[in-house]
Amino acid sequence: MAKKENRVIITLECTEARKEGASPSRYTTTKNKKNQTERLVLKKYNPSLKKHTLHKEIK
């Protein structure tokens, strides 16, 4: 029987773009759900705002 995978694909969405009415940028990445149980927050580049902003994991 195959083992259950620990890595899952997640989507990161910009938090500041919604406040300003711009289209939110989204990034796709993977995370290990055994080591990182809480939601991931990274600082990534948003091309519509032309600056680095916080991106939070969405479902």
UniProtKB/Swiss-Prot annotation:
Keywords: Ribonucleoprotein, Ribosomal protein. Gene3D superfamilies: Ribosomal protein L33 (2.20.28.120). GO terms for molecular function: structural constituent of ribosome. Transmembrane segments: none annotated. GO terms for biological process: translation. The keyword Ribonucleoprotein applies. GO terms for cellular component: cytoplasm; ribonucleoprotein complex; ribosome. Belongs to the bacterial ribosomal protein bL33 family. This is Large ribosomal subunit protein bL33. It comes from Prosthecochloris aestuarii (strain DSM 271 / SK 413).
